[in-house]
Design a protein with these regions (language model features):
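Extended, subdomain-level signal for the structured scaffold at the beginning of enzyme domains
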Residues: 1-121, 133-222
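Alpha-helical segment proximal to the catalytic Tyr-Lys
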Residues: 129
C-alpha cells in the first residue's frame, strides 16, 4: 500500500482573534488509524517546516502518542513543501482542519495540483472540519470542480457561529462548498458526520476526524 499524505496549515493567526494553526486532534486521530494499520504517512504544509498547532491537548492519549512518536515528531516538525512531493508515491491525500486552513488552503495552486493528480490517478481525497477549504477551488483536467455534484461535508455555519468566528474567517465554508457545486449535508453541531462519495471523504468537525481516517482506510483496503 502506498503512503498517505497529510496536509497541515502554515497559517497561525485567526484574524485579530489570536493564534490558530492545524487542529492537533484532526491530525492525531486519523494518524492513529493509519499507523495502527501499518500505513506510512508523510506531512506537508504550504510553507514547509514546523506548522503552528491549535487544539493542543495532551490529556488526549492519542494526541500524546502522536506528539511524542519519534518518527512522526520529526515529520511534523520538518514538514515538506508541496513542490517536494512526488504524487505517485501516495494513495491518498488528507487535509487536516484548524481555522488556519481557511487562509492558506483555498487558493494554493500547488495543493490544488497535488490533489487533482492524486485523485485522477485513482487516489483518495480526504478532509475534515475546515480542511475541505482546500477543495473549493480544485479543478479536474476536464475543467470541472472536484466536488461538483458530490456529497461533501465540513464545518457548518452553525458551528462557526457557536465559536463566534463567522465574522473573522475569510468566508463560511458551508456556503463555499455549496457554491463550488458540492451536495453539502450536516449534522447537529459537534456530532460525528462523514460523507463518502466514491473516493472523496469529508468530515464535519473535530469529532469526525477518526471516522474520516477509518473511511479512508476502508477505501485503501478495497
Amino acid at each position: 500500500m502506498k503512503k498517505v499524505l497529510f496536509v497541515l496549515t502554515s497559517h497561525g493567526e485567526k484574524g485579530n482573534r489570536g493564534s490558530t494553526g492545524y487542529h492537533l486532534g484532526e491530525v492525531s486521530h486519523p494518524w492513529k488509524v493509519f499507523h495502527d494499520a501499518g500505513v506510512e504517512m508523510d506531512f506537508i504544509s504550504p510553507k514547509g517546516g514546523e506548522p503552528p498547532v491549535d487544539g493542543f491537548d495532551l490529556e488526549d492519549p492519542t494526541n500524546l502518542e502522536f506528539w511524542n512518536h519519534p518518527v512522526y515528531k520529526e515529520k511534523r516538525i520538518h514538514t515538506k513543501k508541496p513542490k517536494d512531493i512526488i504524487p505517485s508515491d501516495y494513495s491518498a491525500i488528507y487535509f487536516a482542519g484548524g481555522h488556519g486552513t481557511m487562509w492558506d488552503f483555498p487558493d494554493n495552486t500547488e495543493l490544488q495540483e497535488l490533489t487533482k493528480t492524486i485523485y485522477e490517478s485513482g487516489g483518495i481525497v480526504g478532509a475534515v472540519c475546515h480542511g475541505p477549504s482546500a477543495l473549493v477551488n480544485v479543478k479536474l483536467s476536464n475543467g470541472s470542480k472536484l466536488i461538483a455534484g458530490k456529497r461533501v461535508n465540513g464545518f457548518s455555519n452553525e458551528e462557526e457561529a457557536i465559536v463566534k468566528l463567522e465574522g473573522v474567517v475569510p468566508f463560511l465554508l458551508e456556503n463555499q462548498l455549496i457554491a463550488a457545486g458540492g451536495k453539502y449535508s450536516k449534522s447537529a453541531p459537534w456530532n460525528t458526520h462523514v460523507e463518502v462519495d466514491e473516493r472523496l471523504v469529508t468530515g464535519q468537525n473535530p469529532q469526525s476526524a477518526r471516522a474520516v481516517g477509518e473511511s479512508i482506510l476502508s477505501l485503501l483496503k478495497k
